[in-house]
Regions:
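Sec-dependent N-terminal signal peptides
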Residues: 4-13
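Sec/Tat signal peptide C-region and signal peptidase I cleavage site
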Residues: 15-19
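Accessory terminal helices/loops
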Residues: 20, 230-232, 243-314
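Metallo-beta-lactamase
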Residues: 20-31, 64-66, 72-74, 128-258, ...
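Conserved beta-strand hairpin/beta-sheet module of binuclear metal-dependent hydrolase folds
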Residues: 33-83, 189-201
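Divalent metal-coordination and catalytic microenvironments
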Residues: 34, 59, 69, 84, ...
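Active-site HxH/HxHxD metal-binding segment of metal-dependent hydrolases
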Residues: 82-159, 167
Length: 314
């Protein structure tokens, strides 16, 4: 009888070893004296990356640790806790979630299991969407996209809301909240870490990664990027891709502004989305090698065209 279970046991052990090997390859990059970022893969969630594709970040304060976007799963959250433990034994007191998309925040639960009193902070729109079913939808989608790699991840909802203009103290540090309209997902906050001269942009900015806009507004995300650029911080942590300076927000604005303004132009000339694609692609040639360019360009043009047509009646 025991031999019947041997293939299952071997598969289970093999899967765990594969997960361990994958996550062991990622280390926290030190950005300044208090800030660390684990830069994730730039591909969309799949079995190989086990759903991990964002940039979990953490700040080591005087008495505790603040996490921003811990990632997509219990495995990603475990990796974040592992990297924190390499640097400090201080507890995690706060988690910021930048928006509703589950690749950024479904690791909340594994953090909360270790630190039950952790405050999980997000926009009220995100909290409402999560509790209305988006959290479960994202959990199910990630299981499907990764062929079961994220299975076992549970939902820990944000328990404190913040909106645009809010300044708060977390772990003795100062954070300003920036939110502009619908932007990337109609649930976004950008988090300005004042003492660290850092802006966590969420998915309002991707660097070397083209962002999907199926839940967003091109006009609002451009406004959000204008805000981000105006802050002139030393460090910008994007939702996906390497951390850098303000240039990554400027590049993201260039992509969105170029795409949307050309869609408006060609829409006024009577072109359909498929007819304008090659013209817009030529104008965005500098972004051609960014991850997701071919996959997202046509979709983004179609979404921008719908927004431009709607704007004609406003």
């Amino acid at each position: 009888m025991k031999h019947m279970f041997l293939p299952f046991i071997l598969f289970f052990c093999s899967s765990n070893l594969m997960a361990s090997d994958f996550f062991d390859a990622f280390k926290a990059d030190k950005i300044n004296s208090t800030l660390y970022v684990i830069h994730g893969p730039r591909e969309t969630p799949n079995p190989k990356n086990r759903g991990f594709m964002n940039n979990p970040a953490f700040i080591v304060a005087e008495k505790s640790v603040v996490i921003v976007d811990p990632g997509s799963s219990h495995e990603t959250g475990t990796m974040v806790l592992r990297e924190i433990a390499k640097i400090t034994s201080k507890p995690v007191s706060h988690i910021f979630n930048t928006h509703i998309h589950g690749d950024h925040w479904l690791a909340n639960d594994i953090i909360q299991q270790s630190y039950p009193n952790v405050k999980i902070i997000a926009d009220p729109r995100m909290i409402k969407k999560a509790r209305a079913g988006a959290a479960q939808s994202w959990t199910d989608n990630l299981i499907s996209m990764t062929e079961g790699a994220t299975k076992g991840t549970k939902i820990a909802y944000p328990n404190e809301s913040v909106s645009d203009g809010k300044q708060l103290k977390a772990a003795g540090l100062t954070f300003n909240i920036h939110s502009v309209g619908i932007a990337h997902s109609d649930s976004d906050i950008m988090i300005e870490y004042v003492e660290g001269s850092t802006l966590f942009t969420g998915d309002n900015v991707g660097y070397l990664r083209i962002l999907r806009m199926s839940d967003g507004s091109f006009r609002d995300v451009i406004k959000a990027l204008d805000r981000a650029i105006s802050l002139q911080k030393k460090h910008y942590v994007p939702g996906h891709g390497p951390t850098d300076n303000v240039k990554i927000a400027e590049l993201q604005r260039e992509y969105f502004h170029t795409l949307y303004s050309l869609v408006v132009k060609y829409n006024e000339e009577g072109l359909e989305d498929f007819e304008m694609k090659s013209k817009i692609e030529a104008a965005l040639v500098k972004f051609k090698n960014w991850a997701g360019f071919d996959e997202q360009l046509g979709k983004n043009i179609s979404i921008a065209k719908l927004e431009a047509e709607k704007a004609e009646f406003e």
